[in-house]
UniProtKB/Swiss-Prot annotation:
Coenzyme F430 binds at Q147. This is Methyl-coenzyme M reductase subunit alpha. The modification Pros-methylhistidine is found at H257. GO terms for cellular component: cytoplasm. The modification 1-thioglycine is found at G445. It catalyses: coenzyme B + methyl-coenzyme M = methane + coenzyme M-coenzyme B heterodisulfide. The keyword rRNA processing does not apply. Its cofactor is coenzyme F430. Belongs to the methyl-coenzyme M reductase alpha subunit family. It comes from Methanothermobacter thermautotrophicus (strain ATCC 29096 / DSM 1053 / JCM 10044 / NBRC 100330 / Delta H). The modification 5-methylarginine is found at R271. Binds 2 coenzyme F430 non-covalently per MCR complex. Coenzyme F430 is a yellow nickel porphinoid. Methyl-coenzyme-M reductase is activated when the enzyme-bound coenzyme F430 is reduced to the Ni(I) oxidation state.
Length: 550
């Protein structure tokens, strides 16, 4: 590689040359060096004056700005933003990304159609399917179809709610109104489309998006219930059933249970979360939700690191950072994986090393390959921190560096072997090497899972091993260590990106998010984060329509 991908960011962040070994502290103007902190101070004064209770005051506690309050370049973009703008509370795009996942459920029409034809003796045709879809798109946002005197939601408040379908049968898809169809042929490259259609076959699946405002007011588990209620009512209306007849129970079962795919599984009671909450989203599902693989299919690094960014934000910033810990500092761990092109630089190095020595997906799936590739990439990453002190200051936390170096090592190993388990083994080896070199990895407890994880990479036992694609945030030992889960999701994606696979874990999930009507663009995750940081992203679920005009 010629120029380091992170050099431009370092030059923008610091006055000194990236190679300079000395700098100054305490003379930088404190929080006033930051436009965003200054804005916060002024806003805090206004809030305090209005409510009569003191609010934001950065002079309380540890003084801010003793060192450079550096901007961050969102990787793959030319956008530099302040760190505060990458906190999910301050970033509408990040909020919408999670909203669009949480409010989605996939529901089959196959069982329902069998009930209609076999129990009720009625015919199901493309025309009746289109009529049903017209009905359910009226009902899903919160409108009535079979009852009188029902209150309804304002269409403008729930404009993001709709239902589409997809099928692997081109003839059926062509007969349904295209407004309601996710066109696999249009959305995916030809080879990916053929694979996905073969997986789906003649089945017809609904992709339901309930209103953002509903999932925000309630929770993820509401999604399937809201969906099932409107689907049931729409079936009764579209196929002219009597609401109380026995077949209605079959429709309810199909819509609520039989053919329902949640984006996240139910969590144990000690975590107290239902379906479609972050802790239940498997790494392989998150990789399929991210859509980079259908537009950047010739660049496995880009594809894998877009998944890392998706997971770093969801798992680290929202799940561990707020659901689980209630803190604010977790953003700093997550941003290390998707800013300043550092992880990109390390991973492109690894990909080129693999290509030159083995060829993508051509290396033996052995520990010798793990030892070779993961060691090479780890040493490269550690050398960059030694050579460029500004890089060390950029990622000032040991856990940031450990996550980034290990992610590059894991993805690169997966590129070589076309196997996520060997990629995971490369991650753990990188952690051991890093600790040998620097004597520590991160804050106390950061490396808990890294000290014991290697023992269950290749053993698939009850609570001690799963293919990485099937693991998730609630996997044993993964549950409370920041700076891991997004990277694991990226390593899940890496072998599939190197092979050019159409999906990672579930083809239905991959297709469901290949949808141009989604508010968040899952083909360009990091670009959307940048738009959110610049306050240029327009989210759904806003309440301005029902609040006083200002």
């Amino acid at each position: 590689m010629a120029d380091k991908l992170f050099i431009n960011a370092l030059k923008k962040k610091f006055e000194e040359s990236p190679e300079e070994k000395k700098t100054t502290f305490y003379t930088l103007g404190g929080w006033k060096q930051s436009e965003r902190k200054t804005e916060f101070v002024n806003a805090g004064k206004e809030v305090a004056a209005k409510r009569g209770i003191p609010q934001y005051n950065p002079d309380i506690g540890t003084p801010l700005g003793q060192r450079v309050l550096m901007p961050y370049q969102v990787s793959t973009t030319d956008t530099f933003v302040e760190g505060d703008d990458l906190h999910f509370v301050n970033n509408a795009a990040m909020q919408q990304m999670w909203d669009d996942i949480r409010r989605t459920v996939i529901v089959g029409l196959n069982h329902a159609h069998a009930v209609i034809e076999k129990r009720l003796g009625k015919e199901v045709t493309p025309e009746t399917i289109t009529h049903y879809l017209e009905t359910v798109n009226h009902a899903m946002p919160g409108a009535a179809v079979v009852q009188e005197h029902m209150v309804e939601t304002h269409p403008a408040l729930v404009a993001d709610s709709y239902v589409k379908v997809f099928t692997g049968n081109d003839e059926i898809a062509d007969e349904i109104d295209p407004a309601f169809v996710i066109d696999i042929n249009k959305q995916f490259p030809e080879d990916q489309a053929e694979t996905l259609k073969a997986e789906v076959g003649d089945g017809i699946w609904q992709v339901v998006r309930i209103p953002t405002i509903v999932s925000r007011t309630c929770d993820g588990a509401t999604t399937s219930r809201w969906s099932a209620m409107q689907i049931g009512m729409s079936m009764i209306s579209a196929y002219k059933q009597a609401a109380g007849e026995a077949a209605t129970g079959d429709f309810a079962y199909a819509a609520k249970h039989a053919e329902v795919i949640h984006m996240g599984t139910y969590l144990p009671v000690r975590r107290a979360r239902g379906e479609n909450e972050p802790g239940g989203v498997p790494f392989g599902y998150l990789a399929d939700i991210c859509q980079s693989s259908r537009v950047n299919y010739e660049d496995p690094v880009r594809v894998s690191l877009d998944v890392v960014a998706t997971g770093a934000m969801l798992y680290d910033q929202i799940w561990l950072g707020s659901y689980m810990s209630g803190g604010v500092g977790f953003t700093q761990y997550a941003t290390a994986a998707y800013t300043d092109n550092i992880l990109d630089d390390f991973t492109y190095f690894g990909k080129e090393y693999v290509e030159d020595k083995y060829g993508l997906c051509e290396a033996p799936n052995t520990m010798d390959t793990v030892l070779d590739v993961a060691s090479e990439v780890t040493f490269y990453g550690l050398e960059q921190y030694e050579e460029y002190p500004a890089l060390l200051e950029d990622q000032f936390g040991g856990s940031q560096r450990a996550a980034v170096v290990a992610a590059a090592a894991g993805c690169s190993t997966a590129f070589a072997t076309a196997n996520a388990q060997t990629g995971l083994s490369g991650w753990y080896l990188s952690m051991y090497l890093h600790k040998e070199q620097h004597s520590r990895l991160g804050f106390y407890g950061y490396d808990l899972q890294d000290q014991c994880g290697a023992s269950n990479v290749f053993s698939i036992r009850g609570d001690e091993g799963l293919p990485l694609e099937l693991r998730g945030p609630n996997y044993p030992n993964y549950a409370m260590n920041v700076g891991h889960q997004g990277e694991y999701a990226g390593i899940s994606q890496a072998p599939h990106a190197a092979r050019g696979d159409a999906f990672v874990f579930n083809p239905l999930v991959k297709i469901a998010f290949a949808d141009d009507n989604l508010v968040f663009d899952f083909t360009n995750v990091r670009g959307e984060f940048a738009k959110g940081a610049l306050r240029e992203f327009e989210p759904a679920g806003e309440r301005a329509l029902i609040t006083p005009a200002k």
